[in-house]
């Protein structure tokens, strides 16, 4: 019971998780939408911990393309209407460059047109190649690092690897966008994602 309460508080606090905001480097925001409450909450926490790890590692290494990353995590509870609201909230924030979500078919289907209409790149977790991946086959170093960012040294779940790889693909897209266009925008990142393939922990990933 106490663990559940702590997790709920962490999810609420994670609505806006800023990584490295004390840096003088400009910040770009990555949206993460997942079910942090309800019957699919384990998916949400698996995603949150993995995304948090990936963003921390990128920022600790100096960021990407002259930017630090900030993770904006929103709960859609696996509910289509909440997914629609979360997508709209992220879409109107000009600082949000891309979104990783929504992990479940119906919320993703509902949210996708909102991102498209506003030019927000979406990496749709839950669709190939970002389907559940056996965490027992992930490198031990990743599993240890994942446990270290959780409140109770928890074990990585089936969406840990795919989420980590999605952030890794975004890192590459940000770098390519800056290199090819001299700027990091929704449009330049979308174009870069369309060209990229990235070898991650779970295999080759790309924008489906």
What are these regions (language model features)?
Residues 2-4, 8-15, 20-208:
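Extracytosolic ligand-binding ectodomains
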């Amino acid at each position: 019971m106490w663990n559940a309460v702590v997790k709920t508080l962490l999810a609420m606090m994670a609505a806006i998780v800023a990584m490295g905001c004390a840096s003088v480097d400009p910040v770009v925001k990555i949206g993460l939408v997942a079910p942090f409450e309800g019957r699919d909450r384990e998916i949400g926490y698996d995603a949150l911990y993995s995304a948090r790890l990936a963003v921390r590692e990128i920022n600790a290494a100096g960021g990407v393309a002259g930017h630090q990353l900030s993770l904006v995590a929103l709960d859609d509870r696996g509910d289509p209407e909440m997914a629609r609201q979360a997508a709209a909230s992220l879409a109107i924030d000009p600082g949000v460059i891309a979104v990783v979500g929504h992990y479940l078919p119906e919320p993703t289907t509902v949210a996708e047109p909102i991102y498209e209409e506003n030019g927000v790149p979406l990496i749709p977790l839950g669709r190939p190649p970002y389907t559940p991946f056996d965490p027992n086959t992930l490198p031990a170093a990743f599993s240890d690092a994942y446990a270290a960012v959780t409140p109770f040294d928890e074990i990585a779940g089936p969406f840990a690897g795919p989420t980590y790889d999605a952030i890794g693909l975004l890192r590459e897209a940000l770098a390519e966008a800056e290199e090819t266009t001299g700027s990091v925008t929704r449009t330049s990142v979308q174009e870069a994602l369309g060209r990229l393939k990235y070898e991650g922990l779970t295999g080759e990933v790309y924008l489906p």
